[in-house]
């Protein structure tokens, strides 16, 4: 952050902790309201008037609520995550898979973390996959191949990707990912 032209000027003007706290509060408010376009437009309007996140009503309180939710997810990951030879995985029941997958990756110590959530209305699992910096496999390509072979679809970046997999194929998806990661 420090080596970017705008950021380096701002960090000369403001205390680093001040900037980091405001950035964190803003991030939690954006993520927590990601489906509330009215609130997001309100944020844009306020920020475009050069207001800081700490100056906006209830932003700290909302960020605290979001942190509490993340702590609950982390606790559930610690209790429910399964570790295989080449990856860790977990079915998510009450939050989004993309919110849990980073905890699965980080808590497990594995190079690959997978979180998946059933979409009962569609008969599929929504899958999020993350790789550590030391993961040598392009996960987006691997996920695309494996999910397609199982009647789903997916892909993405080398360290962050996702898929949709038919409900009855999720266990096979995880097994195939574990197997193919081991053969690379």
Tell where the protein language model's regions lie, with residue ranges.
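A structured phosphate/pyrophosphate-recognition subdomain
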Residues: 1-95, 103-110, 116-119, 176
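Glycine-rich, acidic loop segments that terminate in or are immediately followed by a histidine
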Residues: 6, 86-184
């Amino acid at each position: 952050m420090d080596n970017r032209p705008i950021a380096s000027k701002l960090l000369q003007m403001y205390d680093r902790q001040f900037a980091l706290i405001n950035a964190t509060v803003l991030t939690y408010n954006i993520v927590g309201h990601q489906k509330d376009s009215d609130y997001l437009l309100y944020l844009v309007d306020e920020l475009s008037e050069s207001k800081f996140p700490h100056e906006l009503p209830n932003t700290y309180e909302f960020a605290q609520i979001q942190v509490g939710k993340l702590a609950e997810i982390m606790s559930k990951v610690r209790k429910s995550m399964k570790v295989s030879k080449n990856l860790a995985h977990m079915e998510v029941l009450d939050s989004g898979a993309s919110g849990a997958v980073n905890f699965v990756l980080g808590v497990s110590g594995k190079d690959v973390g997978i979180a998946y959530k059933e979409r009962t209305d569609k008969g599929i699992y929504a899958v999020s996959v993350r790789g550590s910096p030391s993961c040598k496999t392009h996960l987006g390509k691997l996920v695309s191949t494996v999910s397609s072979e199982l009647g789903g679809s997916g892909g993405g970046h080398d360290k962050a990707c996702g898929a949709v997999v038919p409900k009855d194929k999720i266990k096979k998806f995880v097994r195939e990912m574990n197997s193919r990661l081991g053969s690379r």
